[in-house]
Amino acid sequence: MTLLLNTTAKLYIAPRTLPFTSSSTFARSPFLRIPSLLKPLSPLTARVSLSSTMGDSADAGMDAVQRRLMFDDECILVDENDRVVGHDTKYNCHLMEKIEKDNLLHRAFSVFLFNSKYELLLQQRSATKVTFPLVWTNTCCSHPLYRESELIDEESLGARNAAQRKLLDELGIPAEDVPVDQFTPLGRMLYKAPSDGKWGEHELDYLLFIVRDVSVNPNPDEVADIKYVNRDELKELLRKADAGEGGLKLSPWFRLVVDNFLFKWWDHVEKGTLKEVADMKTIHKLT
């Protein structure tokens, strides 16, 4: 893993060490309580913005679970070549002011899980999500955290470890149902998308595909609804979103994948030839 020194940055303070505390599944998932074993990066590469550490008065109405995740989770900051340059809170990484002013770019992943009938599992994000509440999106979308197991670049192992963790956290899918070695990383994309006036996304997103029959028990703090769709059903969902029927909305990252890659890759899902289209060398800059 190559670290770049941000020569324009202020002197940064190494983060305090915290155990991982995710949403309500934390209470029922003992292994999620294991603290990170990662030693902090040097102070000059650790990005912490004290000015917004505690948020502001406008955040007072934020859901307690989402607020905790916003301040406890440390995202991995990268440059446009996906080289790690530091880390910062989930809160700061999703503030459009900081995204625009400091060009904060963080690493993310998007899981596309298909069952044995080659139907794609979609989720509707919960109403309490800070960014893009109640939009429909792919199976799971989140961030590798700044911890040893999720910083591993080789074979995208860090992103795959994070995907397994969040599939349990968001959808209650047991780790044994989604072995890390069953994820196929197909590509990376870089995009920016505002959610509202305050929040947004600026991500370098790992696109992970997996074909498994799984048990699902959605976490209501994260997920409002789920559904499996075949190709025709997804096309109908796209039509409704484009027409604005029933207020249906899709996440911008999901739409980018649909418009640029998904249906071509779906052919390879059905043929069992996903590795033939994998391209982890290219970073697709999409708008």
UniProtKB/Swiss-Prot annotation:
Any single GO CC term annotated in Swiss-Prot or TrEMBL for this entry: chloroplast
Cofactor(s) essential for the protein: Mg(2+)
Binding site for Mg(2+): 94, 106, 201, 203
Nudix box (motif): residue ranges: 142-172
Cellular localization per UniProt: Plastid, Chloroplast
Cofactor binding mode and count: Binds 1 Mg(2+) ion per subunit.
UniProt EC number: 5.3.3.2
Gene3D superfamilies in the record: Nucleoside Triphosphate Pyrophosphohydrolase
SUPFAM superfamilies xref list: Nudix (SSF55811)
Active site: residue positions: 141, 203
Annotated organelle transit peptide span: 1-51
CDD domains: NUDIX_IPP_Isomerase (cd02885)
A Pfam family reported for this protein in Swiss-Prot or TrEMBL: NUDIX
Main subcellular localisation: plastid
Subunit organization: Monomer.
Entry-linked PANTHER family: ISOPENTENYL-DIPHOSPHATE DELTA-ISOMERASE
Family: Belongs to the IPP isomerase type 1 family.
Protein name per Swiss-Prot or TrEMBL: Isopentenyl-diphosphate Delta-isomerase 1, chloroplastic
Gene: IDI
